[in-house]
């Protein structure tokens, strides 16, 4: 019976699983969007929401607790300075899971897990692409094709053998 059993093992030892989630939550806070398998994304959502809730407290003790899970100081500062302010008014549900299909190699169901109020990073990329298209030179006309050389006549192999 599975009463009061919470979480997934994901076919890993406890140490491997906790290390994996610490690395994944650090990547999630750094990039604000990562692609992973759906079961990992569902577990990471629980893990990340707890860390963001700690960051919203903003106390030195909360920073120490979050530092256990987010070992990169740069990402930890981003979490407490930027992300905590962004999610201040939100009572929970800081992440979103979007299924994106199946992985080609092993047919595993893949998902994108992202922070709900992501920074608008897509707009500058679109502007850059537009600028590149605008500055692109028009294509030059194609040169006319050269005339083909006449092919040499070949005798079939059987006739050539009989002729000798």
Swiss-Prot record:
GO molecular function terms attached to this record: structural constituent of ribosome
Region (Disordered): 118-164
Any GO BP: translation
Domain of life: Bacteria
GO cellular component terms given for this protein: cytosolic large ribosomal subunit
Family annotation (InterPro entries): Ribosomal_bL17 (IPR000456), Ribosomal_bL17_CS (IPR047859), Ribosomal_bL17_sf (IPR036373)
Keyword field: Ribonucleoprotein, Ribosomal protein
Biased composition (Basic and acidic residues): 126-164
Pfam families per record: Ribosomal_L17 (PF01196)
Family assignment from sequence similarity: Belongs to the bacterial ribosomal protein bL17 family.
Subunit note: Part of the 50S ribosomal subunit. Contacts protein L32.
Protein name per its UniProtKB record: Large ribosomal subunit protein bL17
Species of provenance: Anaeromyxobacter dehalogenans (strain 2CP-1 / ATCC BAA-258)
